[in-house]
């Protein structure tokens, strides 16, 4: 384990029907491979120790005896393995046969979790062989030992308290009220599902949505291991679709019709953080009180130190995809829909504020940069919704020491092409006079030099807003606010900040979307040039007429800064 991550796996072994010896050997081989890769939790399919499709052979004493021998081999091999296994198998208890997941750790059976919901419809007839699992935990005997058996079992790691495991089997997750709901409310952070779900047309997509949706609803990790090749095809075909999901996101999915072992690193810290943030995620019915907890220990030093070279992993590599632009959809169609949605949300927010205050005027400091451009576009949309003339949008451009011809021209052209009013107020003399009043050296280009300009601009915007009875529209975006990249009592102040929840990486796409869809070539050309302009507050004098102060040279590219806010917002 490393930085709150834990490596988990869903494995589909090659099996033979009614051959526990062969099947246990295949399970052990996958266990060895997983251990070499640093896997700490490994889930196998339903009844994989015998095969799901044994039919009436399940009722034969010979098969049940050999199944226990297979389990013994697994237990023996697991003694030196620092991991927890969920192995599907039949289990006799008080004269009845149950479909269960045996939970194994270091040569010990931690518990036996029976399947509660036995399908007996369509192609399934499990009630012919098995008894529905009990919720209340009982003790079952194994080799002279008393083992807890029941649905309401939690398996908690002493050395990593964030890791609390629970199990359900196949059909259990397909019912209206799956056991995993109670598991999660009782404290389980990772759900293991030993499954044997057959293939029918379109079922793979439903299965994918079901598992990802359940992990989202329960704010948990979900490891789904499905039966595959090796099962009898007399009545059913199994595709071995394995899925590892976390809080609604599929971390990895196996190809169907090919037995495989998939691995991923779950972020338990994210799960705990998200549950803490969701104040509605709580055990209203005190379900935890009916659960029993079994404790185990794992080595928490490093999940990656044993990665095999065959896997092509570096020792410090995390087995999960880290989206470099988490706020921006990669699919073009989805990205367009997202941009339209965000622009509508921004405009609706401003529309309500304007209508509530009966405000008919807006004041925007238009610099020719990305943020003020987006603020103008949002304001235009809100004014159009309210049927307020666009000339009531007062764009104020305030050139000073750092303003370049490029941004100045773009600001002026943009205001004219959108139909907004434009006023130019050169603040050079006002700022120079202010610096003279406070005895600041004009050649000293320090924070006073920069912030003096920003505060002068805000003062002008506020005064004009008073004069026209309008509202100053804030331009700062979420990335700048998260970094504190703003001037106190300067550009961080406004009456309504329409960009406050929009990261800089997304600002670019919103402006580009508007440029692509506005239907006005001259306006589109200006917007595209704004996109091509380096991000800058333009508070330092230009060099050879070009921007000398580039924000991303000072605070690093904004792409880096979107990761932290995304993690903070979404756990």
Feature locations, PLM:
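ATP/NTP-dependent adenylation/nucleotidyl-transfer catalytic domains that generate, transfer
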Residues: 161-163, 219-220, 229-232, 246, ...
């Amino acid at each position: 384990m490393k930085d709150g991550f834990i490596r988990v796996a869903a494995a589909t072994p090659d099996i033979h029907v009614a051959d526990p010896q062969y099947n246990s050997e295949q399970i052990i081989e996958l266990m060895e491979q997983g251990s070499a890769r640093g896997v700490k939790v490994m889930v196998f399919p339903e009844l994989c120790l015998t095969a799901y499709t044994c039919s009436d052979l399940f009722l034969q004493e010979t098969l049940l005896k050999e199944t226990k021998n297979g389990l013994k081999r697994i237990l023996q091999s697991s003694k030196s393995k620092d991991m927890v296994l969920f192995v599907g198998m039949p289990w006799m208890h008080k004269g009845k046969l149950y479909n269960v997941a045996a939970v194994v750790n270091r040569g010990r059976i931690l518990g036996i979790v029976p399947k509660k919901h036995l399908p007996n419809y369509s192609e399934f007839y499990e009630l012919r062989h098995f008894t529905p699992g009990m919720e209340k935990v009982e003790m079952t005997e194994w080799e002279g030992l008393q083992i807890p058996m029941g649905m309401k079992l939690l398996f908690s790691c002493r050395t990593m308290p964030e890791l609390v495991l629970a199990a359900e089997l196949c059909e259990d997750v397909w019912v209206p009220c799956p056991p995993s709901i109670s598991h999660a409310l009782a404290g389980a952070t990772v759900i293991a599902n030993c499954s044997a779900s057959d293939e029918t047309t379109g079922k793979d997509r439903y299965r994918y949505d079901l598992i990802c949706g359940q992990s989202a609803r329960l704010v948990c990790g979900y490891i789904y291991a499905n039966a595959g090749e090796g099962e009898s095809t007399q009545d059913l075909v199994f595709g071995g679709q394995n899925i590892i999901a976390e809080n609604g996101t599929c971390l990895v999915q196996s190809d169907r019709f090919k037995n495989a072992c998939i691995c991923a690193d779950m972020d338990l810290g994210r799960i705990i953080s998200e549950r803490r943030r969701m104040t509605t995620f709580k055990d209203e019915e005190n379900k935890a009180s009916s659960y029993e907890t079994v404790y185990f220990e794992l080595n928490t030093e490093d999940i990656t130190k044993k990665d095999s070279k065959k896997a092509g992993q570096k020792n410090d590599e995390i087995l999960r995809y880290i989206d470099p632009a988490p706020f921006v959809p990669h699919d073009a169609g989805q990205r367009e829909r997202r941009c339209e949605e965000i622009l509508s949300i921004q405009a609706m927010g401003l529309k309500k504020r304007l209508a509530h205050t009966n405000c008919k005027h807006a004041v925007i400091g238009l610099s020719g940069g990305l943020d003020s451009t987006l603020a103008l576009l949002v304001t235009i949309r809100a004014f159009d919704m309210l049927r307020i003339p666009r000339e009531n949008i007062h764009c104020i451009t305030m050139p000073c020491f750092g303003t370049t011809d490029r941004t100045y021209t773009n600001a002026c052209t943009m205001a004219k092409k959108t139909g907004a009013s434009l006023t130019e107020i050169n603040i050079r003399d006002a700022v120079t006079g202010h610096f003279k009043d406070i005895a600041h050296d004009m050649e000293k280009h320090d924070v006073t030099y920069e912030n003096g300009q920003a505060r002068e601009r805000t003062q002008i915007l506020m005064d004009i807003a008073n004069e026209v009875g309008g509202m100053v529209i804030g331009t700062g975006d979420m990335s700048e606010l998260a970094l504190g990249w703003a001037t106190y009592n300067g550009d961080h102040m406004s009456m309504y900040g329409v960009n406050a929840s929009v990261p800089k990486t997304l600002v670019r796409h919103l402006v580009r979307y508007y440029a692509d869809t506005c239907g006005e070539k001259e306006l589109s050309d200006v917007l595209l040039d704004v996109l091509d302009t380096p991000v800058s507050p333009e508070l330092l004098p230009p060099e050879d007429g070009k921007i000398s102060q580039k924000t991303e040279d000072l605070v690093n590219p904004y792409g880096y800064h979107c990761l932290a806010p995304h993690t903070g917002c979404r756990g």
